[in-house]
Amino acid sequence: MPMLNAQQFLNQFSLEAPLDESLYPIIRDICQEVKVHGDKALKMYNLTFDHTKTDHLEISHEQIKAAFDTLDEKTKQALQQSYERIKAYQESIKQTNQQLEESVECYEIYHPLESVGIYVPGGKASYPSTVLMTATLAQVAGVENIVVVTPPQPNGVSQEVLAACYITQVDQVFQVGGAQSIAALTYGTETIPKVDKIVGPGNQFVAYAKKYLFGQVGIDQIAGPTEIALIIDETADLDAIVYDVFAQAEHDELARTYAISEDAQVLKDLESRIAKALPNVDRYDIVSKSIANQHYLIHASNFDEACHVMNTIAPEHASIQTVNPQPYIEKVKYVGALFIGHYSPEVIGDYVAGPSHVLPTNRTARFTNGLSVNDFLTRNTVIHLSKDTFEQIADSAQHIAHVEALYNHQQSILIRQS
């Protein structure tokens, strides 16, 4: 972990393409197979990729309710608190139709999407938080049909995931994962309904399938490895910062972590504490590789330079742990989510804070945002002009149409003026 000054870091900073282009033919073939053969293809891929035989793709409502009913009380309460906070936050930011004066002639109205598919990762871990951070938003938006897909497991889908589906009132849950599940949600099969939009994180196969099928179905984003950048000073609790770094690193060997400070000694102390804690860290194989290859210590000469580095990285998660964090809130502009102070660690945002943890990665925070309830709404503009308003603006409209040589456009105006 060599320390770099800000300019050295910026000179070498680059992000590799988040997706492996060699996967394209594989994804194309999987999608075509699902499009043609439907459920038969899904069951074949469950056996091939997930080593699980699935006679029935859909998990019954009785199984979903039983998972909730038999869940231990502490887990049930934790999931419920997370749900309530997410729901309250999303309700507070939801775009709503306003009561307008009759004189208002141009305005917007919002409608919930009809159907949404949610991808919940599986594999070695269970992610009920992904259900909460996506399905709750769709529920608050008023989406009519919420469908969850998640990879099958030999011992069945995680009970915690099913319990989260029960809490968020998901309509259907299917045990199918990977690119094949994205294709199923896009095209529809005998049992899985076609949806209007697909959200939720996944591996490269899932991300590439979403990219490949975008246009036939809406998507939230093309997600890459997780990342965090922290701006810290001498007042930061470095032992806590160590675990803020490890928390991101344990997700993925490609997870990126950045520590930025105007105080070089703070960075040296952090490096020493990371080195001391690393040998005994949980998930050592993953964390150690991430730290070795994707961890950066960046010495900024002043406040403006620290903010410039942060905005250039445009990380999924940004954490400000300094004596006076307030100035950073206005200056740090391009991040997925901004966590301020010692008691707002990024991990609290993963689970219970309220905003969704589905956030832009790979510098896409420079032009897009984290998932919210409003991503499950359509926005329609309404134009309802009076005769007086039409007469005031018609000449300009027909003249612009004439300039563009679109004479039928022009005639559409002129015929109303006559």
Swiss-Prot record:
Family: Belongs to the histidinol dehydrogenase family.
Cofactor binding comment, as recorded: Binds 1 zinc ion per subunit.
Membrane-spanning ranges: none
An example molecular function term from Gene Ontology annotations: NAD binding
UniProt superkingdom: Bacteria
Main function: Catalyzes the sequential NAD-dependent oxidations of L-histidinol to L-histidinaldehyde and then to L-histidine.
Residues binding NAD(+), per UniProt: Y119, Q180, N203
Protein name from the UniProt record: Histidinol dehydrogenase
BP term (GO), one: L-histidine biosynthetic process
Residues annotated to bind substrate: T226, Q248, H251, H317, D350, E404, H409
Enzyme Commission (EC) number: 1.1.1.23
Binding site residues for Zn(2+): Q248, H251, D350, H409
Cofactor(s) this protein cannot do without: Zn(2+)
Keywords for this protein: Amino-acid biosynthesis, Histidine biosynthesis, Metal-binding, NAD, Oxidoreductase, Zinc
UniProt pathway annotation: Amino-acid biosynthesis; L-histidine biosynthesis; L-histidine from 5-phospho-alpha-D-ribose 1-diphosphate: step 9/9
Top enzyme class: oxidoreductase
GO CC annotation terms, alphabetical: cytosol
Reaction catalysis annotation: L-histidinol + 2 NAD(+) + H2O = L-histidine + 2 NADH + 3 H(+)
Species, as recorded: Staphylococcus aureus (strain COL)
Active-site residues, Swiss-Prot/TrEMBL: E316 (proton acceptor), H317 (proton acceptor)
